[in-house]
Amino acid sequence: MAAPPKAWKAEYAKSGRASCKSCRSPIAKDQLRLGKMVQASQFDGFMPMWNHARCIFSKKNQIKSVDDVEGIDALRWDDQEKIRNYVGSASAGTSSTAAPPEKCTIEIAPSARTSCRRCSEKITKGSVRLSAKLESEGPKGIPWYHANCFFEVSPSATVEKFSGWDTLSDEDKRTMLDLVKKDVGNNEQNKGSKRKKSENDIDSYKSARLDESTSEGTVRNKGQLVDPRGSNTSSADIQLKLKEQSDTLWKLKDGLKTHVSAAELRDMLEANGQDTSGPERHLLDRCADGMLFGALGPCPVCANGMYYYNGQYQCSGNVSEWSKCTYSATEPVRVKKKWQIPHGTKNDYLMKWFKSQKVKKPERVLPPMSPEKSGSKATQRTSLLSSKGLDKLRFSVVGQSKEAANEWIEKLKLAGANFYARVVKDIDCLIACGELDNENAEVRKARRLKIPIVREGYIGECVKKNKMLPFDLYKLENALESSKGSTVTVKVKGRSAVHESSGLQDTAHILEDGKSIYNATLNMSDLALGVNSYYVLQIIEQDDGSECYVFRKWGRVGSEKIGGQKLEEMSKTEAIKEFKRLFLEKTGNSWEAWECKTNFRKQPGRFYPLDVDYGVKKAPKRKDISEMKSSLAPQLLELMKMLFNVETYRAAMMEFEINMSEMPLGKLSKENIEKGFEALTEIQNLLKDTADQALAVRESLIVAASNRFFTLIPSIHPHIIRDEDDLMIKAKMLEALQDIEIASKIVGFDSDSDESLDDKYMKLHCDITPLAHDSEDYKLIEQYLLNTHAPTHKDWSLELEEVFSLDRDGELNKYSRYKNNLHNKMLLWHGSRLTNFVGILSQGLRIAPPEAPVTGYMFGKGLYFADLVSKSAQYCYVDRNNPVGLMLLSEVALGDMYELKKATSMDKPPRGKHSTKGLGKTVPLESEFVKWRDDVVVPCGKPVPSSIRSSELMYNEYIVYNTSQVKMQFLLKVRFHHKR
């Protein structure tokens, strides 16, 4: 689930309706309240649990840091100070506090293992370090600081009374005393520079006060004063300016609230080209900001309005119908003219203010960055990560691939996490890289100690989001249970299926009225807001026509704990009316627009319907499929059981992190998958287009396209697709989903589908005949498999179990033209997932559709083959638990080949060439090649170094761009023997 922006929220109560969660008494309107952000149980989002501020202040250690409080800089200064004082810091952004000298320690660092609590950088061995252990710190260990960092937050510390003072050298003592004197001197100077502000003239807040030169050693960084060494030597001066600024803003807002109506506020905002939407408190904020600092220019990304919140200016608009605009700035563009008041206004307060207005406006002073954000550039990445809690993560890793495991270990160690080579009771989680081996000793130990076992995607999300995330949605054990028990059970009646959560799937059906099928599955993913929601809407009619119900179910994708459902009985007419009302409310479009696929337009912040294809009516039910005899050969019968095993498809969907709790297995329509390809292609174009668009614009458009993809293809863990590797993975996932969609119509994933395996075999429209193990073809294929294992593929060996000859309906007729007219025909390998083979056998090998991105294809979109078996076997994606895969041997008419030594983007080879060959550095020994059926070459020689120099390819690849150049000849059932 998405993490809340901050753990706490501070504001003045909008009404008097909320009650304090601590004392249970009402929180009066305009009273300061503090809300702890928690995951809502009834909707996909976070909600504040409101408390009186005084109730929180009466408890210890509730708020860990000022940085954890959203909206603190929008409060009155006195209320800001109350929160800072509670946390224990006299300045915004720090979480340290003063402590009695007897509880403080000073010493020479014996090693470089500790990090400074303020700046998060390492404390070098032999340097002076200080600590102030407080009761509020709890059992976290001693918080150590650099000397400079300690005196910034405790400038008046009596260091001579610290424990360990006498152990320092005379030189170190002099250095410490000089630091104390310097810091005290700076504070005294700052205190003496305070001036009393005029109470009568709002505009007396002069630009000179905000733009005066900074003290030596500081630089301006995006509107904030930051010391390049990580210490802000003018923090007291900034605090003074922030106090004066806050007092001035609140004086102005109080005056506007007293003397200006909400309608006049909107008129004033409209006169200055500002956003006029929202409640009165938002209007007051925008007006006060504009009157004091000048009217804001439009967002450079989407041209919508900007507003100030949480230390920066953010866009209030949408970059597209799929996403909110993510643009933000600390130095927004301001309109270089006076702030206008409504034309013809008679409001004395506004007219008096307008006459006193100065043309030159001051620049808004922003709160200083937190210590972890203001460090040196060299340590910015590490500081950010450790400040968010990755330095607290204790983990161990298990996996079949040591290279992948070591890569993740290094990434997390770089981020500050603590790696354990073995599972011990103190670690937080065990990270599984690749398939989980249930027999692994570390896995068994983790289960015994009840340590969460999480998938490797958890690491990537932690690193991307720069913090330690909850384990719940990444637990591999939970996902396995979900795949077994939470996949929706579909009982198709007519043209649709009643949702099983309604409890009516056995006695009722979805209402159909002519062409209308009153069933909708809606989805919405917004990565900027952390939203990943679904909404199911159905009209359910009893089979006897006696009653009608409107059923709705909603929640967060992949979570059974968040959401709810409702079943309401009503007449047929009322049910249709209510269904259409809810559809309009959730999507912003009429039901008729979706049915007719005309004038339907995705609306910002609204759901989008998914195309769910339940297929046609099934064959008549049979009583007991297990008792039915099969006419298929035993080897073929076992193959059909492999191909039509529903659990295999469920496992694939789980691997892809597709939402199976609300998305019927295999029912995502072809149209939806094509739209998913289009979204990926848009992302690919944005990733390539680095010159023509500003970074902020490109980022917003990438977020919008990612939202679009994960709305169309519901996923448990949506994220922003930022790189080519991730894009390629998603494209391959969609290709696999296409085959699963095809398989769903043949396999029959419905719970009451009971066709025999013979019936399903007939639906493949492909003659499949097992070969005798003593036949010439079988022996040749076995030799080909055993000889052509590449030397670098050492993790497994291959054993041939069965070979089947193939004759797909119509394929030979299409191939005959190329067979007769092209020379250079070869029998080549092709590997694919088990879940893809129903689609392959029934429709042949297919080239990626035009709407798919070209990412991941070395030589463009085509059909790829290999002459070394292990090169293709990699794409079977088998594991220890399911070690049997399927492979193809196809006759490929290559003709004249376009030979290349490195990846080259193309749609097809040049004129006169019929295929492309990527030249590898290791090839089959040509002297061992044999001819099959007179003119087809079988490159079954052992791998040897080639004569090709400077090639970027390890092994040969063969690519054709026309499916008619391929004739599938053999299907192989292969067992993988994993060596580790």
From Swiss-Prot:
Residues 294-338 are annotated as: Zinc ribbon. A zinc finger (PARP-type) spans 8-91, 104-184. It catalyses: NAD(+) + (ADP-D-ribosyl)n-acceptor = nicotinamide + (ADP-D-ribosyl)n+1-acceptor + H(+); L-aspartyl-[protein] + NAD(+) = 4-O-(ADP-D-ribosyl)-L-aspartyl-[protein] + nicotinamide; L-glutamyl-[protein] + NAD(+) = 5-O-(ADP-D-ribosyl)-L-glutamyl-[protein] + nicotinamide. GO terms for cellular component: nucleolus. Pfam families: BRCT, PADR1_N, PARP, PARP_reg, WGR, zf-PARP, Zn_ribbon_PADR1. Residues 180-236, 360-382 are annotated as: Disordered. It comes from the Eukaryota. Its EC number is 2.4.2.30, 2.4.2.-. The keyword Nucleus applies. Residues 198-212 have a biased composition (Basic and acidic residues). Zn(2+) 2 binds at C116, C119, H146, C149. Zn(2+) 1 binds at C20, C23, H52, C55. SUPFAM superfamilies: ADP-ribosylation, BRCT domain, Domain of poly(ADP-ribose) polymerase, Glucocorticoid receptor-like (DNA-binding domain), WGR domain-like. One of its GO terms (biological process) is response to oxidative stress. Residues 385-476 form the BRCT domain. GO terms for molecular function: DNA binding; NAD binding; NAD+ poly-ADP-ribosyltransferase activity; NAD+-protein-aspartate ADP-ribosyltransferase activity; NAD+-protein-glutamate ADP-ribosyltransferase activity; nucleotidyltransferase activity; zinc ion binding. Keywords: ADP-ribosylation, DNA-binding, Glycosyltransferase, Metal-binding, NAD, Nucleotidyltransferase, Nucleus, Repeat, Transferase, Zinc, Zinc-finger. Gene3D superfamilies: 1.10.20.130, 2.20.25.630, 3.90.228.10, BRCT domain (3.40.50.10190), Poly(ADP-ribose) polymerase, regulatory domain (1.20.142.10), Zinc finger, PARP-type (3.30.1740.10). It is found in: Nucleus. Residues 755-980 form the PARP catalytic domain. Coiled coil: none annotated. Residues 230-368 form the PADR1 zinc-binding domain. Involved in the base excision repair (BER) pathway, by catalyzing the poly(ADP-ribosyl)ation of a limited number of acceptor proteins involved in chromatin architecture and in DNA metabolism. This modification follows DNA damages and appears as an obligatory step in a detection/signaling pathway leading to the reparation of DNA strand breaks. This is Poly [ADP-ribose] polymerase 1. The lineage of its organism: Eukaryota, Viridiplantae, Streptophyta, Embryophyta, Tracheophyta. The gene is PARP1.
